């Protein structure tokens, strides 16, 4: 009986701690879009681009622009 009461009290205490922590962290991430674009631009830097004169399309990335199927 004592063990059951101890388990119930422990579960209630942990639940209360999680709820308090969740309320405290609400609204701390102010610029969500900035983080996602920064992450995306970082991944774009690691991909290699095609030099000018190379063929381009949907799957290839040019260092400049893709014009009429060729990188410029």
Curated annotation (Swiss-Prot):
Q: Which residues carry this modification: 4-hydroxyproline?
A: 55
Give the Pfam families listed for this entry.
Answer: Conotoxin
**In the UniProt record, which is one GO cellular component term?**
host cell presynaptic membrane
Q: Which residues form the signal peptide?
A: 1-22
What PROSITE patterns does the database record attribute to this sequence?
A: OMEGA_CONOTOXIN
In the UniProt record, does the keyword GTP-binding occur? no
Disulfide links within the chain: 49-63, 56-66, 62-71
Q: Does the keyword Membrane apply?
A: no
Entry comment describing in which tissues the protein is expressed: Expressed by the venom duct.
UniProt keywords (A-Z) are: Calcium channel impairing toxin, Disulfide bond, Hydroxylation, Ion channel impairing toxin, Knottin, Neurotoxin, Presynaptic neurotoxin, Secreted, Signal, Toxin, Voltage-gated calcium channel impairing toxin
Q: Which GO terms describe its molecular function?
A: calcium channel regulator activity; ion channel inhibitor activity; toxin activity
Please list the residues that make up the propeptide.
23-48
- What is the annotated localization of this protein? Secreted
Q: Which family does it belong to?
A: Belongs to the conotoxin O1 superfamily.
Give the domain section of the comments.
Answer: The presence of a 'disulfide through disulfide knot' structurally defines this protein as a knottin. The cysteine framework is VI/VII (C-C-CC-C-C).
Q: What does this protein do?
A: Omega-conotoxins act at presynaptic membranes, they bind and block voltage-gated calcium channels (Cav).
Name by which UniProt lists this protein: Omega-conotoxin-like SVIA mutant 2
The record lists the organism as Conus striatus (Striated cone)
């Amino acid at each position: 009986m004592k063990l059951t009461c101890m388990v119930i009290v422990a579960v209630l205490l942990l639940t209360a701690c999680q709820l308090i922590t969740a309320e405290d962290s609400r609204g701390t991430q102010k610029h969500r879009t900035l983080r996602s674009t920064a992450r995306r631009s970082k991944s774009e830097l690691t991909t290699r681009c095609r030099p000018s004169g190379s063929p381009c399309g949907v799957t290839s990335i040019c260092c400049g622009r893709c014009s009429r199927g060729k990188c410029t």
